[in-house]
Amino acid sequence: MPTPRKIETVSTLTEKLNRAQLVVVADYRGDGKGMSVADMTELRRKLREHGGEVVVAKNTLLKIAAHNTGHEALDPLLAGPTAVTLGYDDVSKVAKALLDYLKSGNKSFTVRGALLGNTLLPADALEQVTKLPSREQALAQVVGGIAAPVSGVVGVLNAAISNVLYVLQARIDQLQPQGETA
């Protein structure tokens, strides 16, 4: 029988997994002795600055939450001591903050894999995620792609109207006697 605390934990994890655009699964005891509280606090602070967070929970509860959200692909990654990094808004910034932390020399935190949207990625693909455009950049590219043809049409229509006006002005100039001006 599930306890109320476990039910609440699964509910919270389900909500967080639903919101997350990026889910990175890692072992937080990679070198055997595990991460210190100070290291985990530093990682959490860095991720929070970029719209992410780290959650440590039991694998069984994470699996239930993953199944609740349709992220069954996470199942093979959920074994052993597991920390889940969640990126909510700008996934490239969250991935970069995580990679920067990993490159700082902490061997206790080793990435097993990631889920970007509904795509399962191997651990080494996290670097590619850092190269994705931010949400604002992606929206700007989409708007630019949509606006470019529209501005081209406006330019063509504007040129056509101007050409008609130039032809009319030339005809008026032809019809007027040489001494008069319009």
Curated annotation (Swiss-Prot):
The protein's name: Large ribosomal subunit protein uL10
Biological process, per Gene Ontology:
translation
Q: Which Pfam families match?
A: Ribosomal_L10
| UniProt family annotation | Belongs to the universal ribosomal protein uL10 family.
> Entry's InterPro entries?
Ribosomal_uL10 (IPR001790), Ribosomal_uL10-like_sf (IPR043141), Ribosomal_uL10_bac (IPR022973), Ribosomal_uL10_bac_type (IPR047865)
The record's annotation in SUPFAM superfamilies points to: Ribosomal protein L10-like
**Molecular function GO labels:** large ribosomal subunit rRNA binding; structural constituent of ribosome
